Each structure stands twice: as structure tokens, then as C-alpha cells.
């Protein structure tokens, strides 16, 4: 049955145009959604409706005004949709939601020891750390990598590695909550003068616990050996127990200092951190700066000599602290380690006598020079060539005072055609660095002298090796020094399948013995391994570098 047609058109009866096609409108976006983003489906519908062409006008052309109004409405809606595409930025959290997302922070994955580089762009400018996964990202603006990470993964809490401020992304507001103070302290530890002065007091052998419940002692923590950087670890362990240098690095503000000083200061403060999340630290950040500054002379992938590295490190640290190349004592490094040495040189000439015999004659004049030193090199006697009755090599022993006689001013050392004598001058520095020379190179191989150096950890009298000066030090009075740190070399056999094929029969391993002044106990630090050791066993290893501290006047040695 066919549909009956209408007798009259609706427009003729009502006198109005046909109702125009209404588009979906959004009222007050901020009131309805409270700063949240519209669903993706609704935004897609709005775009689709906005792109539809308007209905054609009727034959009388009575819908032109409606068409213009609809075009204006479409333009307004398109502008509104563009504004609603990005999440809204906020200057402050909503009332009652100031701790939003803080429960997502995972402290067990946070590690601020590595170099601050964006994991996407590798940039070191304006770097933020995600407190949920621990990764580094650059910036926090709408087009930054941290912003995209917050949208894609749903990690919302970030900390600025330079200012230590915490932000929530993508909203962008700063979070001020006392529960975040422990994270800020681990990222950049800061100490008061009273806390630093109490580190070495007797009876202050403090204990601390990491997040996992592991007990550790601040100042005596393991250091990560990334590959072959144990030579660096032992040097930093020794320097971190030199009180004047340590206190200077922990208390001064190095925000405008060169990167070498800034990163060393952060590493030393982390070594002495009593509220650390982990019971060890990683020197990666400082090693990267050292590798860059030394033109890859010292890296984390190749073994180096600790004395060679310490010499380079102290000289560059002296310059970075504003020290002068000509003026002595112009930095903390020189005030702690630098001393004066008198060198007497006498030339030796070879002549033939009447019987055509070669005779050596000493020059009548003796030239005396005063030089400044940072290290005192001690020469070991040559190792014996013969074996004992069991056909084993004899490992000789020599006391420390015997090899120190090089600096008594009487024993001569011959170098080519010159005879030299050495004598220390007053005043001696607060700390002495002894380099026990064990390695020598010839045209073919590097030789190692395994001689054991015996010593007492306390009561080393340096007065016999110093030229008397009554105006500085009383005649006949001892000058006591006590051992602070002892770097020991250990030769370890390599793997037969790898290193033996390459011709390496043994490899070098370094460890550091440091004194805990609070409990008067000795601690051995070898990479991540930290354990106590009796003081009677200190000299059994192959000592290579020693740090001795001058005892203050009136302080009695007891142990």
C-alpha cells in the first residue's frame, strides 16, 4: 500500500524553515570535567560533525542567515576542540590532592650515581629523573621527553637533578611534601659543620641501614667496579679519609665550580651518607668526567697505575680549585700534601790516568736545590735471584725506616754522571704520600718486586729525615706520623682459556686499607667487599701507596 502524500508543505503551514542540523555542544569544560581530558571517542565525533557540509538551502533561499550562523558555530567549536587536545597545565595541585601519585614512587630502583644524561636524547641539560622507574629524561614542557614519558607510560613524579625540585607531569605543578626529603638527600646530600666534625670522633662508630635492611658504616662503603676501575676506587677511598680535604669537599658550595670538583664533592658526600638507599656507591659520573678531561688516559675499561692516576688527579684538582702553577700553597690540595725537599747534586767525571786506567773524580762544588714534592718515592732493594732449598723464590722483607733512609741526607743516589742526596725540610705537610716503587719496565717486560715492607701503623718518627731548623721545630723532638690509608697490590692469576692465550699470566688487583678513627679498627675495601682486618696483618700485602697523617702536638699515640 503506497504512502499518502501530504496535502501541504510544512514550511507553508508554519511559515518557518526546516530545523537545521544541530551539532553536539560542550558546555563549561572546566566545570564538567574538572581539568580532565575528554574521551577520545567524543573528540572524534566532534571533529566528524564539524567537517560535515551544511544542508543546501531551499528553493526560496531562506536559509542563508542560518548557514552563516552555523559556519560561525563550527569555527568556534574547532577552536574549542584545539584548546581541549592537550592536558591542562596547573600551577598547584587541586585542593585535597597534594599527595596525588606519590604512592607510585619506587625507592628501590632509584640510583642517582650515574651520569645525568637523558635516556632518549643523551643531553645533560635540564635533566629530570623519573621517581617511578629511575630513568633520566630531559625537560618537563609539553614537548619534552619527560612529558611524553608521563603520557605514554603513566609515570607522573619527576625530580630535577640540579634544583632537587619535584614535579608532577603532565600537569606540571611542583610537589612540596616532607615525605620526599629522603629522596632529595640521597640525590644531593648536604651536611652541617657539626655533623662533619663529628665523623671521626671516638665512640662515633655509627651504623646505618639501607632500604633492603643491609647494615653498613657511613664512610666505609663498597664502590662498584664497572670493569677495570679498581685503581680509581682505592684512590677515592684513601682521599675520602683525609679529614681536611674531605671536610672541605663536604662543606663548601661548588655549584659554580668545574665539573671535576663538583662531581668529586658529590661522590665524597655520598660515601659518608648515613641515609643511603644502597650500601654501596658507583663512581660512574666522576669517571666519565675524568675520562673526558684526561683524553681517555684514565678510563673505566682499562687498568691504570694508582700513583700515576693520583698524581694527575691532584694536579688537575689543584688547578680546578683555583690554584696557581707558580705560587705554592694556593689550594687545599697543596696545603694538605705539598712539602719541600733539598737536593744536593755533585757531578762525577771519568778520566784516564797514566796507566790508562779509568778513574772517577768528584767535582769540588756541590749544587743545592730546593724542590717541592707531593709524593715521596721509596726504592725497594732488588729481589734475590736464587731460590731456597724447597726451590721456591724467597720473598724478602724490609722495614719502612730502612727505605726511608734515602732522605736522611747522607745516603747518596747515583743517576748517570751525578751523585744526589735528599733531605726533607721544615715544615712537613700535614699528610705524607709514600710511593713504594714496585714496578719497573725494560725493553721487553714489566717486572714486579714482591718485597714485603714491614711497618707499624703508628709512631713513625720523621725527625731523622728532616734537616734541623730550631726556629720551626725543637731539636731532638720527634715528628710523629700515623697511617691513615694503605693501598695494596695483589697479583691474581688470569683465566687459562682467555688471558693465558693473550700472554697475560697475571692481572693486577687493588684494595685499600683505611682506618676507622671512631672505633680504631682497620677496614679493607676492595670494590664492593668491605670487611674488618687486624692491624697486625696490614703489612703482609704488597703495599704500594701509603697516606700518613701528622699527629698534632700533645696528642699521645695509643693503641
What is each stretch, according to the model?
Residues 2-559:
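UBL (ubiquitin/ubiquitin-like) substrate-recognition surfaces
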